[in-house]
Regions:
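N-terminal strand-loop-strand
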Residues: 6-48, 75, 79
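Hydrophobic pocket/interface hotspot
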Residues: 33, 63, 67, 119
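Short, catalytically relevant binding-site loops at active-site mouths
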Residues: 37-39, 53-55, 82-87
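Active-site-adjacent beta-strand/loop module that shapes the phosphate/pyrophosphate-binding cleft
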Residues: 5-7, 25-27, 86-109, 124, ...
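Nudix hydrolase/Nudix homology domain
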Residues: 39-45, 55, 114-185
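The catalytic Nudix box helix
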Residues: 48-80, 100, 108
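Short, conserved, surface-exposed binding loops centered on an aromatic residue
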Residues: 11-13, 22-23, 69-74, 88-92, ...
Length: 185
């Protein structure tokens, strides 16, 4: 097979794709990590567990895998709550970072020591009130707690969910009370 003259091929990889998980325990503690290495010359800060998607990996699978790899905590995907698009990331490429709400299936931490310096369950109010935590991290945690987000959906004509992922907005937004209430379901 040969490409035709009009074929559109990107000249190079243009984006990094990553995902982080907002994981809230039954006792209103947020699963957080501190990486071993800072970014942009800054000291490592507490943040959500997460990382890069692997080639061919779906978003929902990737965030569950990343949280498990970094923390040892098993989770189940609930929803996509927000994302950030940032230009000028590594090597001048753009970065898309998805924030997902996950439900913990286990709570025992087994920290991955190659990349992670510290991992713990932190009271959510302590996280939000901590001056040493970035405003971005606080903002995305609030987004994860205050809206129900978008849930996976099957779209007619696209039955293979391994090939394509679709997320649709839920019809209500009742915040933290709803998030806490759904844990048992």
């Amino acid at each position: 097979r040969r490409l035709v003259e009009e074929a559109h091929i990107p000249p190079y990889a243009s984006h990094y794709i990553g995902a982080g998980g907002v994981v809230l325990s039954e006792s209103d503690e947020l699963l957080v990590v501190r990486e071993r290495f800072g970014f942009g010359g800054r000291a490592p800060m507490m943040k959500l567990p997460g990382g890069a998607l692997q080639a061919g990996e779906n978003l929902a699978e990737a965030v569950v895998r990343e949280v498990l790899e970094e923390t040892g905590v098993e989770t189940r995907f609930e929803s996509l709550v927000c994302f950030r698009h940032w230009h000028g990331y590594r090597y001048g490429k753009s970065d898309i970072y998805f924030v997902c709400r996950l439900r913990p299936v286990s709570t025992t931490i087994t920290m991955q020591t190659e990349e992670i310096q510290e991992c713990l369950w932190m009271p959510v109010e302590e996280f939000l009130g901590n001056d040493a935590i970035s405003e971005f991290s606080k903002w995305i945690v609030r987004a994860g707690l205050e809206n129900r987000g978008m849930v996976p959906a099957t779209v007619g004509g696209f039955p293979d969910t391994r090939e394509r992922e679709f997320f649709v907005a839920t019809d209500t937004s009742d915040g933290l009370a709803s998030f806490r209430g759904r844990r048992g379901s």
